[in-house]
């Protein structure tokens, strides 16, 4: 059924302006029949951050910015969904056009700028679906014009703790000026200290909601050392590696589109983001799990990301080119790999190639 839907919808959506196509996809999912998803093979189950994931495939933040369709996405077979980025106040984001397809590269450039309906609207939607179950994380960000960006994160933690399965602290978007500075040592330490304190203040009414940190792929290894050290010292529950890149690989074929400002995602990000997963994995030393993001467009790519050190993976841009059927395809491929190799679970292979990957030459961009 999903494959038939993809066959009909993908040509139409790709003909439309990218942002109009995205809006149409959201509207279509709002009317998705409430069908029960196919049960996942138990071998795909993952335990991470104190949560039980039915499978390791998540919808990355950026697709459902304001919590309009998390349950529809779960019914399509995702093991978890991350909504956002949400900011305290609504904001329209950067001027259009701000979303670009690089068709021949199977890539996307965006400079959206945290456009979303604001915390009140997203909170109301998540509260209304609380009884539905499923893992729905909340990616939190700061308003562009905020005089206290760290305070924005604190407000969101306190507000969403009762309805969030986990939080992602997004300090790595390249589309809000100055935001990536919060990845730097003392600033990051202050941010995480205040976020964890906020989580502790609402623990009694909301439980121990996991806090994850999402980082950029453009960090130097020295910067990564500092980020991991701070994350470990502040006892975050995990990291998401990685956000979009501001780099432009020399191999990009859509040369004119590649000049657009913003974050690059999709297939060209795969090698860099996977290397960053491996580099992070060896530095974390098992202190917490990782979520791998960037260029996952097949079962083989998902497996590579897991072997680099990711316990879970997320995708988004690849759906633009492969359709929603990609989720079930990846799950089938992962299950087949486990059966063929006699493994009982994906945890048996997490990080198996990390040492090898970190010894290789740095992937060219």
Swiss-Prot record:
UniProt keyword list: Cell membrane, Flavoprotein, FMN, Membrane, Oxidoreductase, Pyrimidine biosynthesis
Gene Ontology biological-process entries: 'de novo' pyrimidine nucleobase biosynthetic process; 'de novo' UMP biosynthetic process; pyrimidine ribonucleotide biosynthetic process
Residue positions binding substrate: 65, 110-114, 170, 175, 243-244
Pathways involved: Pyrimidine metabolism; UMP biosynthesis via de novo pathway; orotate from (S)-dihydroorotate (quinone route): step 1/1
Catalytic activity, reaction form: (S)-dihydroorotate + a quinone = orotate + a quinol
Cofactor: how and how many bound: Binds 1 FMN per subunit.
Compartments it resides in: Cell membrane
Family classification: Belongs to the dihydroorotate dehydrogenase family. Type 2 subfamily.
Quaternary data: Monomer.
Protein name: Dihydroorotate dehydrogenase (quinone)
Gene (UniProt): pyrD
